[in-house]
């Protein structure tokens, strides 16, 4: 964690592209936020890769057209620096901007879905294979996918191995068993020794590679000092007192929990208990512009180059978005109990950079927020299930030596097959977990492309025609949904409808300016509206709720904003209209948007008259 995996991957990609005469790089990341974060870094790197011709670059995910860095590059070649030589340029070419052609550009940054869809039977899948076949493929945070997504990742790796495409997989917390599965997928033409030592290595940082015939490994020595992190158990009631003591002489704290609702609850508790501290929220249920502004502010205040004046007395309460997308440097960390690999990712934000810290915070300390009872937090259980939480709680030590303990701790939690039978409760949780994993794999297998198989006489070759007999997704949006498990998510554009019926941006967005509702907005205004995007909480996407949600949103849009559907940028979008108090009623839920807290919701209370 924090040892330069990205820079090492790009250096390796440059060497392999030169050695094998490849024409570009695909960089896949788990979320749109992480893809946006790496895009700027890859721009500068890609700009140095050719001294003769401009290179095409693409940002490939569902909201790429709303990314300001990406938009500024559209319309031809753009110099990244004012004094850059004329020949050192990158470009976003119009031809590559369609979803079908995006992977054909020389350099592509996107969500991992773009790679997973190469393993999905859908129309034009051959263009994805064509785009990937001439590149070096880099996948970051490859531990971050569930059993469902892993089925598509493994099948994609089988085809990339068949094409002899170099693949670089990055993770700081990858279990050894999963590492072996990834290598076996890529090497599927070759039988690998099931007892080979590389399968069980626990070094860190560990480099594992294959030359097509055998698997090799080396532990890379670090020239940076390690550290010991003290772990302490904590309940929610004890949290304010702990932070009061730890921040008595200044410094900043991070509190990472597993659900947005829990983050909002904790933030309110801390604001009431610690009025002399500044409490900031950071989670996924902010409008895109609000989240971007918060991210930029947090990077300035507690990022790598922050100063004590900006850090002191700041508490950031967030969710999993703090695990992956932000290079934060926290003086003290509180994390809710989560699977061990993710807990270690969170600890990677603690004392991340060398700096002078207040005396009470010079020893790295992480408090693990738990219920204090045998049962798990309901929200955590809904996100991660009970088995991995149970295993993590069982093996959680009193202190962690970084980086020495990273791999052994991950192995302890995930390598349960080598252990003696668990307690009756443990066996029950394990059985439930394994059954759920098998169900995920079964669902994923329905629309997987076949494996690459051919006999010695090339008589039994799988062809693209064979793949199309059972097309799994007919649109790009449907394909993205098909490679991720779970209920569909509902995304909305958030605007305000004031007394009298006028439509406005929220008061702090675009100055709260009004937008005509009876005609399509001009392109510049439509782009600003399209950026007011928000993903509704998961409850609104549940099978028993989603149809009602979409029906009500669509009815309001037809009534008030029908003309907006004539705008290319807004066509097909759902708009959530808030009232003067920034609240709305949707599918028996009351929603409220707040600039500091993001979107909150609760079930509507019906009076007695409604029950008759």
Residue ranges, per PLM feature:
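Walker A/P-loop NTP-binding motif
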Residues: 6-23, 41, 157-159
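A substrate-engagement module of RecA-like helicase motors
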Residues: 42-107, 112-116
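Conserved Walker A/P-loop ATP-binding site and its immediately adjacent core
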Residues: 23-47, 59-65, 174-178, 260
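Post-DEXD/H (motif II) to motif III coupling segment of the RecA-like Helicase ATP-binding lobe
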Residues: 127-136, 143-217
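Conserved interdomain linker/interface between the two RecA-like ATPase lobes of SF2 helicase motors
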Residues: 190-263
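C-terminal helicase lobe and adjacent C-terminal extensions/tails of nucleic-acid helicase motors
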Residues: 179, 237, 241-306, 330, ...
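Walker A/P-loop
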Residues: 1-13, 145-146, 171
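Conserved two-lobed SF2 helicase motor
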Residues: 101-119, 308-323
